[in-house]
């Protein structure tokens, strides 16, 4: 999957374009519903993402909005692509809705910024590191643990999409905590070093001596897109959650707050480049 090809992200883009086209055409949702003998709720649910859009409906709406033949064709292709099952469909039994959305945003972003504490980011984890970690989390469900390992390794293909830029800040605890064994950690550090040398990947760490810094207690990711507002993903003791710009909720923060925190740490001098000596000093014989 390349940038912006995830079906979930395509569905979001499709409904945004349909809504924008309707507004540009000067039509109300009621007028569109009347034209096609639909209930007004159908138009509302299409535009807010409650239901999908069939290729037939996309064609009809594009015509009603007086789009050019080129714009109509783009919408039809978008509707067709948005209905394809995602590659992670076989793993849905071990995925939360938030994780499904997370992967969609991860694959569709032009810039991914991630802060991690305690454990290595999933995109960096070796198979043995991931297995050691997930077997402990899924002690009563070994089959689920193995599926989650497969899913995590499969996700890492996104790092090969060079048009997506990745920036990671790791708390030093990530580098010091042994997961599995010293041998697993040596292999993990080798992988981290190799991945950090990719042209589209930048990795920093914040040493313990830096003390407290913005939002250092909560792992988070911020996704920036070519179109639309940024989205933030948080991992807390209460579970996973997604934050959208100007959305109400218990957190009351916007993705922009997390983006600002990330950039503040990145530019403050607290975030340092990783090195081979740093990574291996704890895991040598």
Show the residue positions of the predicted features:
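Active-site-proximal binding-pocket segments
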Residues: 170
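Short, charged recognition helix plus adjacent turn
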Residues: 73-107
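Basic, Lys/Arg-rich alpha-helical nucleic-acid-recognition elements, primarily the DNA-binding modules
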Residues: 1-86
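Short glycine-rich anion-binding loops that position phosphate/pyrophosphate groups of nucleotides
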Residues: 173
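Amphipathic alpha-helical interface segments
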Residues: 2-4, 119, 124-127, 132-163, ...
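Internal helix-loop-helix
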Residues: 110-115
